[in-house]
Amino acid sequence: MSMSNSLKKLSSCVLIDLDGTLINTDGVVGDILRKYLCKYGKQWDGRESLKIVGKTPVEAATTIVEDYELPCKVDEFNSEFYPLFSAQMDKIKSLPGANRLIRHLKCHGVPVALASNSSRANIESKISYHEGWKECFSVIVGSDEVSKGKPSPDIFLEAAKRLKKDPADCLVIEDSVPGVMAGKAAGTKVIAVPSLPKQTHLYTSADEVINSLLDIRLEKWGLPPFQDWIENTLPIDPWHIGGPVIKGFGRGSKVLGIPTANLSTKDYADELVEHPSGVYFGWAGLAKRGVFKMVMSIGWNPYFNNKEKTIEPWLLHDFTEDFYGEELRLIIVGYIRPEANFSSLESLIAKIHEDREVAEKALDLPSYAKFKGDPYLTK
Protein backbone atom coordinates (compact mmCIF):
# COMPACT_ATOMS: atom_id res chain seq x y z
CA MET A 1 0.00 0.00 0.00
CA SER A 2 1.52 3.33 1.06
CA MET A 3 4.60 4.51 2.87
CA SER A 4 5.22 8.09 3.91
CA ASN A 5 8.40 10.02 3.24
CA SER A 6 8.86 10.71 6.94
CA LEU A 7 10.96 7.60 7.60
CA LYS A 8 14.22 8.89 9.10
CA LYS A 9 15.55 6.26 11.49
CA LEU A 10 15.72 2.51 11.34
CA SER A 11 14.28 0.30 14.06
CA SER A 12 15.90 -2.01 16.58
CA CYS A 13 12.78 -3.50 18.17
CA VAL A 14 9.08 -4.11 17.53
CA LEU A 15 6.05 -3.18 19.64
CA ILE A 16 3.05 -5.10 18.38
CA ASP A 17 -0.65 -5.10 19.15
CA LEU A 18 -2.56 -8.34 19.76
CA ASP A 19 -6.30 -8.17 18.97
CA GLY A 20 -6.94 -7.61 15.28
CA THR A 21 -3.22 -7.51 14.53
CA LEU A 22 -1.99 -10.97 15.51
CA ILE A 23 -5.28 -12.73 16.28
CA ASN A 24 -8.81 -12.49 14.87
CA THR A 25 -10.55 -11.46 18.08
CA ASP A 26 -13.12 -9.39 16.20
CA GLY A 27 -14.63 -12.49 14.57
CA VAL A 28 -15.32 -14.21 17.89
CA VAL A 29 -16.56 -10.99 19.52
CA GLY A 30 -18.96 -10.44 16.63
CA ASP A 31 -20.37 -13.95 16.90
CA ILE A 32 -20.97 -13.54 20.64
CA LEU A 33 -22.56 -10.10 20.28
CA ARG A 34 -24.81 -11.35 17.50
CA LYS A 35 -26.29 -13.95 19.86
CA TYR A 36 -26.17 -11.80 22.98
CA LEU A 37 -28.06 -8.86 21.49
CA CYS A 38 -30.86 -11.12 20.26
CA LYS A 39 -32.21 -11.48 23.78
CA TYR A 40 -32.78 -7.72 23.81
CA GLY A 41 -34.38 -7.77 20.38
CA LYS A 42 -31.33 -6.10 18.86
CA GLN A 43 -29.31 -7.10 15.80
CA TRP A 44 -25.53 -6.96 15.49
CA ASP A 45 -24.62 -6.26 11.89
CA GLY A 46 -20.97 -5.33 12.32
CA ARG A 47 -21.41 -1.63 11.66
CA GLU A 48 -20.46 -0.86 15.24
CA SER A 49 -17.08 -2.53 14.73
CA LEU A 50 -15.49 0.72 13.63
CA LYS A 51 -16.49 2.29 16.95
CA ILE A 52 -15.05 -0.42 19.19
CA VAL A 53 -11.94 -1.65 17.37
CA GLY A 54 -8.83 -0.68 19.29
CA LYS A 55 -10.65 0.53 22.39
CA THR A 56 -10.22 -0.75 25.93
CA PRO A 57 -12.76 -3.36 27.06
CA VAL A 58 -14.61 -0.83 29.22
CA GLU A 59 -14.77 1.74 26.41
CA ALA A 60 -16.01 -0.87 23.94
CA ALA A 61 -18.66 -2.10 26.38
CA THR A 62 -19.82 1.46 27.03
CA THR A 63 -20.21 2.06 23.30
CA ILE A 64 -22.31 -1.08 22.84
CA VAL A 65 -24.56 -0.42 25.85
CA GLU A 66 -25.19 3.18 24.81
CA ASP A 67 -25.57 2.70 21.06
CA TYR A 68 -27.92 -0.26 21.41
CA GLU A 69 -29.74 1.35 24.35
CA LEU A 70 -29.42 -1.82 26.40
CA PRO A 71 -31.36 -1.95 29.68
CA CYS A 72 -28.24 -2.71 31.72
CA LYS A 73 -25.18 -0.98 33.10
CA VAL A 74 -21.73 -1.39 31.60
CA ASP A 75 -20.47 -3.55 34.47
CA GLU A 76 -23.54 -5.77 34.14
CA PHE A 77 -22.89 -6.14 30.42
CA ASN A 78 -19.28 -7.09 31.08
CA SER A 79 -20.23 -9.59 33.77
CA GLU A 80 -22.41 -11.38 31.21
CA PHE A 81 -20.20 -10.92 28.15
CA TYR A 82 -16.80 -11.98 29.48
CA PRO A 83 -17.75 -15.50 30.60
CA LEU A 84 -19.12 -16.04 27.09
CA PHE A 85 -15.93 -14.62 25.59
CA SER A 86 -13.65 -16.68 27.83
CA ALA A 87 -15.46 -19.85 26.79
CA GLN A 88 -14.73 -19.05 23.13
CA MET A 89 -11.15 -17.85 23.58
CA ASP A 90 -9.69 -21.09 22.28
CA LYS A 91 -11.45 -20.47 18.96
CA ILE A 92 -9.61 -17.19 18.27
CA LYS A 93 -7.32 -17.94 15.34
CA SER A 94 -4.04 -16.28 14.50
CA LEU A 95 -4.20 -13.98 11.49
CA PRO A 96 -2.32 -14.87 8.29
CA GLY A 97 1.34 -13.96 8.65
CA ALA A 98 1.23 -13.50 12.44
CA ASN A 99 3.00 -16.71 13.42
CA ARG A 100 5.53 -16.21 10.64
CA LEU A 101 6.31 -12.67 11.81
CA ILE A 102 6.82 -13.19 15.52
CA ARG A 103 8.82 -16.40 15.09
CA HIS A 104 11.04 -14.72 12.50
CA LEU A 105 11.76 -11.83 14.86
CA LYS A 106 12.45 -14.23 17.73
CA CYS A 107 14.78 -16.32 15.55
CA HIS A 108 16.80 -13.23 14.63
CA GLY A 109 17.02 -11.90 18.17
CA VAL A 110 14.84 -8.84 17.61
CA PRO A 111 13.25 -7.68 20.90
CA VAL A 112 9.45 -7.75 20.65
CA ALA A 113 6.93 -6.29 23.08
CA LEU A 114 3.28 -7.29 23.02
CA ALA A 115 1.38 -4.08 23.81
CA SER A 116 -2.40 -4.37 24.00
CA ASN A 117 -5.46 -2.51 25.26
CA SER A 118 -6.58 -5.77 26.86
CA SER A 119 -5.73 -6.50 30.48
CA ARG A 120 -2.51 -8.38 31.19
CA ALA A 121 -4.42 -11.46 32.38
CA ASN A 122 -6.59 -11.38 29.26
CA ILE A 123 -3.52 -11.15 27.04
CA GLU A 124 -1.88 -14.10 28.79
CA SER A 125 -5.02 -16.19 28.37
CA LYS A 126 -5.34 -15.42 24.66
CA ILE A 127 -1.75 -16.22 23.72
CA SER A 128 -1.78 -19.43 25.79
CA TYR A 129 -3.78 -21.02 22.97
CA HIS A 130 -0.97 -20.32 20.48
CA GLU A 131 1.91 -22.67 21.12
CA GLY A 132 5.28 -21.01 21.59
CA TRP A 133 4.00 -17.46 21.35
CA LYS A 134 4.69 -16.32 24.91
CA GLU A 135 8.38 -17.12 24.53
CA CYS A 136 8.54 -14.85 21.46
CA PHE A 137 7.78 -11.73 23.50
CA SER A 138 10.46 -10.06 25.59
CA VAL A 139 7.84 -7.86 27.25
CA ILE A 140 4.04 -7.92 27.63
CA VAL A 141 2.13 -4.76 28.58
CA GLY A 142 -1.63 -4.56 29.19
CA SER A 143 -3.85 -1.53 29.60
CA ASP A 144 -4.31 -2.26 33.31
CA GLU A 145 -0.57 -1.69 33.83
CA VAL A 146 -0.59 1.95 32.72
CA SER A 147 -2.61 5.08 33.48
CA LYS A 148 -4.43 5.25 30.15
CA GLY A 149 -4.99 2.87 27.26
CA LYS A 150 -4.65 3.68 23.57
CA PRO A 151 -4.91 6.25 21.95
CA SER A 152 -2.81 7.50 24.86
CA PRO A 153 0.88 6.64 24.23
CA ASP A 154 1.27 5.14 27.73
CA ILE A 155 1.24 1.47 26.68
CA PHE A 156 3.90 1.92 24.01
CA LEU A 157 6.03 4.19 26.19
CA GLU A 158 5.95 1.59 28.95
CA ALA A 159 6.82 -1.19 26.49
CA ALA A 160 9.80 0.79 25.16
CA LYS A 161 10.91 1.54 28.72
CA ARG A 162 10.85 -2.13 29.69
CA LEU A 163 12.83 -3.01 26.56
CA LYS A 164 15.26 -0.21 27.49
CA LYS A 165 14.76 1.35 24.06
CA ASP A 166 14.21 4.90 22.87
CA PRO A 167 10.68 5.09 21.37
CA ALA A 168 12.24 6.58 18.23
CA ASP A 169 14.04 3.25 17.73
CA CYS A 170 10.81 1.24 17.99
CA LEU A 171 8.52 0.03 15.22
CA VAL A 172 4.85 -0.29 16.16
CA ILE A 173 2.54 -2.65 14.23
CA GLU A 174 -1.16 -1.86 14.74
CA ASP A 175 -4.56 -2.61 13.22
CA SER A 176 -6.66 0.14 14.82
CA VAL A 177 -6.83 3.91 14.53
CA PRO A 178 -6.44 4.40 18.32
CA GLY A 179 -3.38 2.15 18.18
CA VAL A 180 -1.81 4.14 15.34
CA MET A 181 -2.51 7.37 17.22
CA ALA A 182 -0.88 5.92 20.33
CA GLY A 183 2.21 4.85 18.42
CA LYS A 184 2.68 8.23 16.79
CA ALA A 185 2.08 10.04 20.09
CA ALA A 186 4.78 7.86 21.67
CA GLY A 187 7.25 8.93 18.99
CA THR A 188 7.59 5.55 17.31
CA LYS A 189 7.39 4.58 13.68
CA VAL A 190 4.08 2.89 12.86
CA ILE A 191 2.93 0.30 10.35
CA ALA A 192 -0.86 0.12 10.08
CA VAL A 193 -2.54 -3.14 9.10
CA PRO A 194 -6.22 -2.08 9.02
CA SER A 195 -8.50 -4.78 10.40
CA LEU A 196 -11.66 -3.27 8.92
CA PRO A 197 -12.27 -3.32 5.15
CA LYS A 198 -12.28 -0.16 3.06
CA GLN A 199 -11.04 2.03 5.92
CA THR A 200 -7.45 2.74 4.88
CA HIS A 201 -8.23 6.45 4.52
CA LEU A 202 -8.39 6.65 8.32
CA TYR A 203 -4.75 5.63 8.73
CA THR A 204 -2.95 8.51 7.01
CA SER A 205 -0.87 9.30 10.10
CA ALA A 206 0.88 5.91 9.93
CA ASP A 207 4.34 5.73 8.35
CA GLU A 208 3.18 2.82 6.22
CA VAL A 209 -0.16 1.15 5.54
CA ILE A 210 -0.12 -2.48 4.39
CA ASN A 211 -2.87 -4.89 3.44
CA SER A 212 -1.88 -7.72 5.79
CA LEU A 213 1.07 -9.12 7.71
CA LEU A 214 1.91 -11.15 4.61
CA ASP A 215 3.00 -7.88 2.99
CA ILE A 216 5.36 -6.61 5.67
CA ARG A 217 8.90 -5.94 4.42
CA LEU A 218 11.05 -5.74 7.51
CA GLU A 219 14.16 -4.66 5.63
CA LYS A 220 12.55 -1.26 5.05
CA TRP A 221 12.92 -0.69 8.78
CA GLY A 222 16.44 -2.04 9.23
CA LEU A 223 15.21 -5.39 10.53
CA PRO A 224 16.20 -8.85 9.23
CA PRO A 225 14.32 -9.61 5.99
CA PHE A 226 12.23 -12.71 5.42
CA GLN A 227 13.91 -15.34 3.27
CA ASP A 228 10.84 -17.41 2.39
CA TRP A 229 9.68 -15.72 -0.84
CA ILE A 230 10.12 -18.01 -3.88
CA GLU A 231 9.97 -16.63 -7.44
CA ASN A 232 7.94 -13.61 -6.26
CA THR A 233 5.51 -15.81 -4.33
CA LEU A 234 5.03 -16.59 -0.66
CA PRO A 235 4.17 -20.15 0.40
CA ILE A 236 1.21 -20.26 2.81
CA ASP A 237 -0.51 -22.96 4.80
CA PRO A 238 -2.79 -24.57 2.19
CA TRP A 239 -6.51 -24.04 2.52
CA HIS A 240 -9.35 -25.77 0.73
CA ILE A 241 -12.66 -24.50 -0.60
CA GLY A 242 -15.17 -25.94 -3.01
CA GLY A 243 -18.69 -25.88 -4.35
CA PRO A 244 -20.75 -25.70 -7.53
CA VAL A 245 -19.70 -23.10 -10.10
CA ILE A 246 -22.19 -20.24 -10.33
CA LYS A 247 -22.58 -17.23 -12.60
CA GLY A 248 -20.69 -14.18 -11.38
CA PHE A 249 -20.81 -10.50 -12.29
CA GLY A 250 -20.52 -11.24 -16.00
CA ARG A 251 -17.46 -9.06 -16.41
CA GLY A 252 -14.72 -11.72 -16.39
CA SER A 253 -15.04 -12.80 -20.00
CA LYS A 254 -16.97 -9.83 -21.38
CA VAL A 255 -15.06 -6.93 -19.82
CA LEU A 256 -11.68 -8.37 -18.89
CA GLY A 257 -11.37 -11.21 -21.36
CA ILE A 258 -10.55 -13.42 -18.39
CA PRO A 259 -13.12 -16.16 -17.63
CA THR A 260 -13.37 -16.72 -13.88
CA ALA A 261 -15.17 -19.59 -12.17
CA ASN A 262 -17.23 -18.24 -9.30
CA LEU A 263 -18.34 -19.95 -6.10
CA SER A 264 -21.13 -18.86 -3.76
CA THR A 265 -19.69 -16.72 -0.96
CA LYS A 266 -22.29 -18.10 1.45
CA ASP A 267 -20.53 -21.44 1.41
CA TYR A 268 -17.18 -20.13 2.63
CA ALA A 269 -17.94 -16.96 4.59
CA ASP A 270 -15.48 -17.92 7.35
CA GLU A 271 -12.63 -18.29 4.86
CA LEU A 272 -13.38 -14.87 3.42
CA VAL A 273 -13.08 -13.30 6.86
CA GLU A 274 -9.91 -15.16 7.80
CA HIS A 275 -7.89 -14.46 4.67
CA PRO A 276 -6.76 -10.98 3.65
CA SER A 277 -7.56 -9.48 0.30
CA GLY A 278 -5.01 -10.15 -2.40
CA VAL A 279 -3.94 -12.39 -5.25
CA TYR A 280 -3.33 -16.06 -4.51
CA PHE A 281 -2.71 -19.19 -6.56
CA GLY A 282 -2.95 -22.94 -6.38
CA TRP A 283 -4.71 -25.88 -7.98
CA ALA A 284 -8.29 -26.30 -9.20
CA GLY A 285 -10.05 -29.61 -9.66
CA LEU A 286 -13.12 -30.50 -11.71
CA ALA A 287 -14.08 -34.14 -11.21
CA LYS A 288 -15.01 -34.71 -14.87
CA ARG A 289 -12.25 -32.59 -16.41
CA GLY A 290 -9.08 -32.87 -14.34
CA VAL A 291 -6.76 -30.65 -12.30
CA PHE A 292 -5.58 -27.25 -13.51
CA LYS A 293 -3.33 -24.42 -12.42
CA MET A 294 -5.24 -21.53 -10.92
CA VAL A 295 -4.72 -17.90 -9.91
CA MET A 296 -7.39 -16.00 -8.00
CA SER A 297 -8.29 -12.74 -6.35
CA ILE A 298 -9.82 -12.35 -2.93
CA GLY A 299 -11.31 -9.02 -1.99
CA TRP A 300 -13.44 -6.07 -2.93
CA ASN A 301 -12.02 -5.46 -6.40
CA PRO A 302 -11.61 -1.70 -5.86
CA TYR A 303 -11.61 -0.93 -9.61
CA PHE A 304 -15.21 -2.20 -9.78
CA ASN A 305 -15.98 -1.20 -6.16
CA ASN A 306 -17.58 -4.47 -5.11
CA LYS A 307 -20.08 -4.24 -2.26
CA GLU A 308 -19.13 -7.69 -0.98
CA LYS A 309 -15.84 -9.50 -0.57
CA THR A 310 -15.53 -12.24 -3.19
CA ILE A 311 -13.26 -15.01 -4.42
CA GLU A 312 -12.73 -15.13 -8.18
CA PRO A 313 -10.54 -18.02 -9.41
CA TRP A 314 -9.18 -18.12 -12.95
CA LEU A 315 -8.45 -21.65 -14.15
CA LEU A 316 -5.43 -21.43 -16.42
CA HIS A 317 -6.77 -23.60 -19.22
CA ASP A 318 -8.71 -22.94 -22.42
CA PHE A 319 -12.11 -24.57 -21.95
CA THR A 320 -14.37 -25.01 -24.97
CA GLU A 321 -17.58 -24.84 -22.95
CA ASP A 322 -18.97 -23.47 -19.69
CA PHE A 323 -19.15 -25.70 -16.64
CA TYR A 324 -21.77 -23.97 -14.49
CA GLY A 325 -23.11 -26.28 -11.80
CA GLU A 326 -20.08 -28.57 -11.77
CA GLU A 327 -18.27 -29.10 -8.46
CA LEU A 328 -15.08 -27.04 -8.29
CA ARG A 329 -12.41 -27.79 -5.69
CA LEU A 330 -9.57 -25.38 -4.92
CA ILE A 331 -6.36 -25.74 -2.94
CA ILE A 332 -4.74 -22.36 -2.35
CA VAL A 333 -1.01 -22.77 -1.71
CA GLY A 334 0.66 -19.40 -2.27
CA TYR A 335 0.35 -15.62 -2.17
CA ILE A 336 1.47 -13.14 -4.83
CA ARG A 337 0.50 -9.60 -3.83
CA PRO A 338 -2.04 -7.43 -2.02
CA GLU A 339 -5.22 -6.20 -3.65
CA ALA A 340 -4.74 -2.93 -5.54
CA ASN A 341 -6.71 -0.32 -7.41
CA PHE A 342 -5.88 0.67 -10.98
CA SER A 343 -6.18 3.89 -12.94
CA SER A 344 -7.46 2.13 -16.06
CA LEU A 345 -9.03 -1.10 -17.22
CA GLU A 346 -5.97 -1.73 -19.39
CA SER A 347 -3.59 -1.56 -16.43
CA LEU A 348 -5.83 -3.92 -14.44
CA ILE A 349 -5.88 -6.47 -17.27
CA ALA A 350 -2.11 -6.21 -17.71
CA LYS A 351 -1.56 -6.88 -14.00
CA ILE A 352 -3.90 -9.88 -14.02
CA HIS A 353 -1.91 -11.41 -16.88
CA GLU A 354 1.30 -10.69 -14.99
CA ASP A 355 -0.17 -12.54 -12.00
CA ARG A 356 -0.98 -15.44 -14.30
CA GLU A 357 2.63 -15.67 -15.46
CA VAL A 358 3.89 -15.61 -11.88
CA ALA A 359 1.44 -18.34 -10.83
CA GLU A 360 2.12 -20.60 -13.82
CA LYS A 361 5.85 -20.46 -13.24
CA ALA A 362 5.60 -20.96 -9.48
CA LEU A 363 3.28 -23.97 -9.71
CA ASP A 364 6.00 -25.89 -11.56
CA LEU A 365 8.22 -25.65 -8.47
CA PRO A 366 8.27 -28.83 -6.34
CA SER A 367 7.06 -27.02 -3.20
CA TYR A 368 3.83 -26.09 -5.01
CA ALA A 369 3.56 -28.84 -7.64
CA LYS A 370 3.22 -31.53 -4.96
CA PHE A 371 -0.32 -30.37 -4.17
CA LYS A 372 -1.57 -31.21 -7.65
CA GLY A 373 -2.12 -34.80 -6.58
CA ASP A 374 -4.15 -33.99 -3.48
CA PRO A 375 -7.24 -36.25 -3.55
CA TYR A 376 -9.42 -33.36 -2.36
CA LEU A 377 -9.27 -31.87 -5.85
CA THR A 378 -11.09 -34.67 -7.62
CA LYS A 379 -13.06 -36.61 -5.00
Curated annotation (Swiss-Prot):
<keyword id="KW-0418">Kinase</keyword>
<keyword id="KW-0067">ATP-binding</keyword>
<comment type="pathway">
    <text>Cofactor biosynthesis; FMN biosynthesis; FMN from riboflavin (ATP route): step 1/1.</text>
</comment>
<dbReference type="InterPro" id="IPR041492">
    <property type="entry name" value="HAD_2"/>
</dbReference>
<feature type="binding site">
    <location>
        <position position="262"/>
    </location>
    <ligand>
        <name>ATP</name>
    </ligand>
</feature>
<feature type="binding site">
    <location>
        <position position="260"/>
    </location>
    <ligand>
        <name>Mg(2+)</name>
    </ligand>
</feature>
<dbReference type="InterPro" id="IPR036412">
    <property type="entry name" value="HAD-like_sf"/>
</dbReference>
<keyword id="KW-0460">Magnesium</keyword>
<dbReference type="InterPro" id="IPR023468">
    <property type="entry name" value="Riboflavin_kinase"/>
</dbReference>
<dbReference type="InterPro" id="IPR006439">
    <property type="entry name" value="HAD-SF_hydro_IA"/>
</dbReference>
<feature type="binding site">
    <location>
        <position position="17"/>
    </location>
    <ligand>
        <name>Mg(2+)</name>
    </ligand>
</feature>
<feature type="active site" description="Nucleophile; for riboflavin kinase activity">
    <location>
        <position position="312"/>
    </location>
</feature>
<keyword id="KW-0288">FMN</keyword>
<keyword id="KW-0007">Acetylation</keyword>
<comment type="subunit">
    <text>Monomer.</text>
</comment>
<comment type="function">
    <text>Bifunctional enzyme that catalyzes the hydrolysis of flavin-mononucleotide (FMN) to riboflavin (vitamin B2) and the phosphorylation of riboflavin to form (FMN) coenzyme.</text>
</comment>
<keyword id="KW-0378">Hydrolase</keyword>
<protein>
    <recommendedName>
        <fullName>Bifunctional riboflavin kinase/FMN phosphatase</fullName>
        <ecNumber>3.1.3.102</ecNumber>
        <ecNumber>2.7.1.26</ecNumber>
    </recommendedName>
</protein>
<dbReference type="InterPro" id="IPR015865">
    <property type="entry name" value="Riboflavin_kinase_bac/euk"/>
</dbReference>
<keyword id="KW-0285">Flavoprotein</keyword>
<feature type="binding site">
    <location>
        <position position="337"/>
    </location>
    <ligand>
        <name>FMN</name>
    </ligand>
</feature>
<keyword id="KW-0479">Metal-binding</keyword>
<feature type="binding site">
    <location>
        <position position="254"/>
    </location>
    <ligand>
        <name>ATP</name>
    </ligand>
</feature>
<feature type="binding site">
    <location>
        <position position="342"/>
    </location>
    <ligand>
        <name>FMN</name>
    </ligand>
</feature>
<feature type="binding site">
    <location>
        <position position="248"/>
    </location>
    <ligand>
        <name>ATP</name>
    </ligand>
</feature>
<feature type="binding site">
    <location>
        <position position="324"/>
    </location>
    <ligand>
        <name>ATP</name>
    </ligand>
</feature>
<dbReference type="GO" id="GO:0009398">
    <property type="term" value="P:FMN biosynthetic process"/>
</dbReference>
<dbReference type="InterPro" id="IPR023214">
    <property type="entry name" value="HAD_sf"/>
</dbReference>
<dbReference type="GO" id="GO:0009231">
    <property type="term" value="P:riboflavin biosynthetic process"/>
</dbReference>
<dbReference type="Pfam" id="PF01687">
    <property type="entry name" value="Flavokinase"/>
</dbReference>
<keyword id="KW-0547">Nucleotide-binding</keyword>
<dbReference type="GO" id="GO:0008531">
    <property type="term" value="F:riboflavin kinase activity"/>
</dbReference>
<dbReference type="GO" id="GO:0005524">
    <property type="term" value="F:ATP binding"/>
</dbReference>
<feature type="active site" description="Proton donor; for FMN phosphatase activity">
    <location>
        <position position="19"/>
    </location>
</feature>
<dbReference type="InterPro" id="IPR023465">
    <property type="entry name" value="Riboflavin_kinase_dom_sf"/>
</dbReference>
<dbReference type="GO" id="GO:0000287">
    <property type="term" value="F:magnesium ion binding"/>
</dbReference>
<keyword id="KW-0511">Multifunctional enzyme</keyword>
<comment type="similarity">
    <text>In the N-terminal section; belongs to the HAD-like hydrolase superfamily. CbbY/CbbZ/Gph/YieH family.</text>
</comment>
<feature type="binding site">
    <location>
        <position position="260"/>
    </location>
    <ligand>
        <name>ATP</name>
    </ligand>
</feature>
<dbReference type="GO" id="GO:0003919">
    <property type="term" value="F:FMN adenylyltransferase activity"/>
</dbReference>
<feature type="binding site">
    <location>
        <position position="19"/>
    </location>
    <ligand>
        <name>Mg(2+)</name>
    </ligand>
</feature>
<comment type="similarity">
    <text>In the C-terminal section; belongs to the flavokinase family.</text>
</comment>
